[in-house]
A protein has these predicted regions:
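Conserved structural motif at the start of ABC-family nucleotide-binding domains
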Residues: 4, 18-19, 74
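The feature captures the beta-strand-to-loop junction immediately N-terminal to the Walker
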Residues: 34-36
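Helix-to-loop junction immediately C-terminal to a conserved catalytic motif
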Residues: 49
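Conserved ABC transporter NBD signature motif
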Residues: 57-68, 72-73
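ABC-family P-loop ATPase nucleotide-binding domains
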Residues: 81-137
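Catalytic Walker B motif of ABC-type/P-loop ATPase nucleotide-binding domains
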Residues: 150-154
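Helix N-cap at the start of a conserved alpha-helix in ABC-type nucleotide-binding domains
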Residues: 161-163
């Protein structure tokens, strides 16, 4: 069963439109949502979660219509958005005490397990954490109510290479049980080269391609030149696609 199915999702703003976005996330897989800044990645995630109200389309989670069963679905997902500072002067323990009230399946033992795993001190204030530790804390909250689907917006943005490497390793461990899945947006394509199973590429509010990573890479073979001795990387695909789009628009 698909954990997430997004069907023809659209949202229009002055000067920008998310148009007929469709893709699916399956159990035990990591889906990377790529695109340059302003392509529509965050709007897609916010529309999926009903943080902004889509103009049309539907979202199914765990076989249920998300917009009709939003409360029930949100019990089974974890959401991490970059740049969220919660209450910077509050201790982690205080933030957790409030957060746990929202989840019927909150598991304190599991929470303490992740605190130890991520080397987090819940007597620290949120503002005292590095960017990497903030993401780990938010992941701890997301995982402590047995979330089946994690939705992450630019989770590795602004992290140093060591912290990014550690988080990508954590993502792989999370999905190793083949029951949980991750959907995360990023413009750092090297992260997806290392951990993604599937790729959805958004350009100017449209899904250019959504497929498993190997099929995705093969579908852009037409961008290769006689000088390319190896298959194109995600970064090369994105650069050549965006450059082509810019050249056509400029001309």
């Amino acid at each position: 069963m698909k954990l997430l199915s997004v069907n023809h999702l659209s949202k229009r703003y002055p000067g920008f439109a998310l148009q007929q976005v469709s893709f699916s996330v399956y159990p035990g897989r990591i889906m990377g949502l790529i695109g340059k800044n302003g392509a529509g990645k965050s709007t897609t995630l916010k529309s999926i979660l009903n943080m902004v109200h889509p103009d049309s389309g539907d979202v199914k989670m765990f076989g249920m219509d998300f917009y009709q069963h939003e409360k029930e679905c949100k019990q089974q997902i974890g959401v991490v958005f970059g740049g969220v500072d919660f209450y910077p002067l509050k201790k982690l323990s205080s933030i957790t005490a409030v957060t746990r009230r929202f989840y019927n399946a909150w598991d304190q033992e599991k929470y303490e397990h992740y605190l130890n795993l991520f080397d987090l001190d819940d007597e620290k204030k949120f503002k005292e954490l590095s960017n990497g530790m903030k993401v780990k804390y938010l992941l701890s909250l997301a995982l402590s109510h047995h979330a089946k689907l994690l939705i992450l917006d630019e989770p590795t943005s602004g992290l140093d290479p060591v912290s990014r490497d550690e988080l990508l390793h954590i993502f792989k461990r999370i999905t190793a049980d083949k029951a949980r899945s991750i959907l995360f947006s990023t413009h750092i394509t090297s992260d997806l080269d290392r951990c993604a199973d599937d790729i959805t590429y958004i350009q100017n509010g449209n899904v250019l391609k959504s497929a498993d990573k190997d099929a995705f890479l093969r579908s852009f073979d037409h961008l290769r030149t006689s000088e390319d001795k190896q298959p194109l990387t995600l970064e090369e695909i994105m650069l050549r696609t965006e450059r082509s789009d810019f050249d056509e628009t400029a001309l």
